[in-house]
């Protein structure tokens, strides 16, 4: 598989008018293979298993929010970077998940070929399926290099997507609290 991938990169370099045997490009096919192997490593992991490994009984019934989880992914249409942040909240229903598992889950989904809308839904669904909370809220804000580097070339444009479940849809106060918290000042100093 690696050899086939590297040969494809060599062919691509040749097609665009480059010499894959010149000094700066000799190891490029191998480097690109390793980069893509890492950038798509999310296919080798199950986010629901990661979440399920750290479930704890809790009487907490207030919002748990982890915001500003930075990520990068690859657009499935152009294989160009998506760079952004995710805000994830849920209202427990007898169980909480270990905090480190939320960014791990985000990374698993981000390290797949993606569209932002799908990734937002996948994160919400995984939390909903594994911990069965009273509600889930996910907001993803990202820059898409397929928009900035080609096509319309709109540098610094951002896309925001959301997925709301349970009480985040049904209860306007919960929804307001969530959006208020994720929009409060971002810098925290301890």
Curated annotation (Swiss-Prot):
Gene Ontology cellular-component annotations = cytoplasm
Single biological process term from Gene Ontology:
tetrahydrobiopterin biosynthetic process
Please name the pathway: Cofactor biosynthesis; 7,8-dihydroneopterin triphosphate biosynthesis; 7,8-dihydroneopterin triphosphate from GTP: step 1/1
Key word GTP-binding present? yes
Question: What does the entry list as the binding residues for Zn(2+)?
Answer: 75, 78, 146
**Pfam families, per this entry?**
GTP_cyclohydroI (PF01227)
EC assignment: 3.5.4.16
Known catalysed reaction(s)?
GTP + H2O = 7,8-dihydroneopterin 3'-triphosphate + formate + H(+)
Q: Which InterPro entries match?
A: GTP-CH-I_C/QueF, GTP-CH-I_N, GTP_CycHdrlase_I, GTP_CycHdrlase_I_CS, GTP_CycHdrlase_I_dom
Which keywords describe this protein according to UniProt? Answer: GTP-binding, Hydrolase, Metal-binding, Nucleotide-binding, One-carbon metabolism, Zinc
Please provide, alphabetically and separated by semicolons, the GO molecular function terms listed in this UniProt record: GTP binding; GTP cyclohydrolase I activity; zinc ion binding
Per the UniProt entry, the disulfide pairs are none
Query: Quaternary structure per UniProt?
Result: Homomer.
HAMAP family reported for this sequence: FolE
UniProt lists the family membership as follows: Belongs to the GTP cyclohydrolase I family.
Q: Which NCBIfam families match?
A: folE, PRK09347.1-2, PRK09347.1-3
- What is this protein called in UniProt? GTP cyclohydrolase 1
What is the species of this protein? Campylobacter concisus (strain 13826)
């Amino acid at each position: 598989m690696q050899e086939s991938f590297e040969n494809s990169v060599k062919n691509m370099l040749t097609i665009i008018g480059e010499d894959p045997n010149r000094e700066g490009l000799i190891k490029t096919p191998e480097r690109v293979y390793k980069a893509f192997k890492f950038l798509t490593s999310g296919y080798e992991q199950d986010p629901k298993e990661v979440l399920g490994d750290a479930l704890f009984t809790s009487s907490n019934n207030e919002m748990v929010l982890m915001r500003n989880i930075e990520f990068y992914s690859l657009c499935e249409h152009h294989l160009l970077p998506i760079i952004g942040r995710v805000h994830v909240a849920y209202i427990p229903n007898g169980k909480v998940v270990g905090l480190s598992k939320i960014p791990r889950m985000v990374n698993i989904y981000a390290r797949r070929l993606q569209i932002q809308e799908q990734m937002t839904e996948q994160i919400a669904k995984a939390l909903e399926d594994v911990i069965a909370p009273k509600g889930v809220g996910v907001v993803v804000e990202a820059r898409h290099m397929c928009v900035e580097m080609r096509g319309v070339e709109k540098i610094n444009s951002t896309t925001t997507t959301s997925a709301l479940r349970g009480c985040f849809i049904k209860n306007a106060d919960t929804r307001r609290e969530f959006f208020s918290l994720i929009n409060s000042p971002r810098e925290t100093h301890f």
